[in-house]
Swiss-Prot record:
Its cofactor is Mg(2+). This is Holo-[acyl-carrier-protein] synthase. Signal peptide: none annotated. One of its GO terms (biological process) is fatty acid biosynthetic process. It is found in: Cytoplasm. The lineage of its organism: Bacteria, Pseudomonadati, Pseudomonadota, Betaproteobacteria, Nitrosomonadales. The gene is acpS. It comes from Nitrosomonas eutropha (strain DSM 101675 / C91 / Nm57). Pfam families: ACPS. Its EC number is 2.7.8.7. InterPro entries: 4-PPantetheinyl_Trfase_dom, 4-PPantetheinyl_Trfase_dom_sf, ACPS, Ppantetheine-prot_Trfase_dom. It catalyses: apo-[ACP] + CoA = holo-[ACP] + adenosine 3',5'-bisphosphate + H(+). Transfers the 4'-phosphopantetheine moiety from coenzyme A to a Ser of acyl-carrier-protein. One of its GO terms (cellular component) is cytoplasm.
Amino acid sequence: MIYGIGTDLVDPARIAGSLERYGERFARRVLADSEWSEYVRQTRPEVFLAKRFAAKEAFSKAVGTGLRTPVMFGNIAVQHDTQGKPYFEFHQELIDWIGQRGIVSHHLSISDELTLASAFVVLEK
């Protein structure tokens, strides 16, 4: 049974502006610790951040809370399996919170073009 769905669109140029204005502080706010090593290797960091931002926003919409404790950027990491399929990795606090709501699985799709990054999330209970 579907618990919730969420989607988000982000303009990488907007992210580039935030990076110019706030620098590394902005990236650290968006990324979980486990995403940092991949981020620093990016040739287009604004696209990398736009996709993560969109994915995390879409998750917050799917759970119906928006970004508020414990649904926070730092508690959510986007990872990829061996085939390249994206999935979420959650901090323990968020794992517990998700479990209390009966959410048993999630599905994440991320896409990007030159001027747009998008994410779609489905949560099941």
